């Protein structure tokens, strides 16, 4: 995790939004660790809207509409699912403090979810933070094949439709790179972020 890290003795929702506006985001070492630290990567993960790529097979799956897609329907369930340990994710950085903070951001209209439902069962989803014309993706989970990927496709469609200019993924992963995510140097990211913060806060 290249970049600067600094511990924070206490974070309020307003401080959290201010941090996002200047390029910082919080993490914990583990779900059981009460400490939170700020992260500012040297290379920032960004998913450019004009280079967003969906494979033919995934596009075909999306068209079949295997799940009901909902927005902002079950925030606490989504972040709880993202915090769960799984075989592919034995540890998580989402602790109780982070869950509480983002739940408050949801109540304030700054945190949002995209959810995949199969009947009455939540089977995939993602959450993130909106500020200005930027959306900061935080975490995702999947309990069915392609569920989180389909949520990402719907997220990008939604952000494009609403006029967002920046989709920040924090870091890039091989998974996100298949969608077109790139690493952006800190200085270039700062310019992109400044432009997004000059925008009025967009409706998600």
From Swiss-Prot:
Q: Which InterPro entries match?
A: Acyl_CoA_acyltransferase, Leu/Phe-tRNA_Trfase, Leu/Phe-tRNA_Trfase_C
- Primary site of residence: cytoplasm
The record ties this protein, via Gene3D superfamilies, to:
Leucyl/phenylalanyl-tRNA-protein transferase, C-terminal domain (3.40.630.70)
SUPFAM superfamilies according to UniProt: Acyl-CoA N-acyltransferases (Nat)
Highest taxon in the source lineage: Bacteria
Q: Its catalytic activity?
A: N-terminal L-lysyl-[protein] + L-leucyl-tRNA(Leu) = N-terminal L-leucyl-L-lysyl-[protein] + tRNA(Leu) + H(+); N-terminal L-arginyl-[protein] + L-leucyl-tRNA(Leu) = N-terminal L-leucyl-L-arginyl-[protein] + tRNA(Leu) + H(+); L-phenylalanyl-tRNA(Phe) + an N-terminal L-alpha-aminoacyl-[protein] = an N-terminal L-phenylalanyl-L-alpha-aminoacyl-[protein] + tRNA(Phe)
The record's subcellular location field reads: Cytoplasm
Which Pfam family, an example, fits this chain? Leu_Phe_trans
Give the record's GO CC terms. Answer: cytoplasm
For this protein, the Enzyme Commission number is 2.3.2.6
Any GO molecular function: leucyl-tRNA--protein transferase activity
Q: Name one GO biological process term.
A: protein catabolic process
- Key words, A-Z: Acyltransferase, Cytoplasm, Transferase
Entry similarity comment: Belongs to the L/F-transferase family.
Q: Which PANTHER family match?
A: LEUCYL/PHENYLALANYL-TRNA--PROTEIN TRANSFERASE, LEUCYL_PHENYLALANYL-TRNA--PROTEIN TRANSFERASE
HAMAP family per record: Leu_Phe_trans
Report the protein's function.
Answer: Functions in the N-end rule pathway of protein degradation where it conjugates Leu, Phe and, less efficiently, Met from aminoacyl-tRNAs to the N-termini of proteins containing an N-terminal arginine or lysine.
Spell out the protein name for this chain.
Answer: Leucyl/phenylalanyl-tRNA--protein transferase
Give the species this sequence originates from: Rhizobium johnstonii (strain DSM 114642 / LMG 32736 / 3841)
Give me the gene this protein comes from. Answer: aat
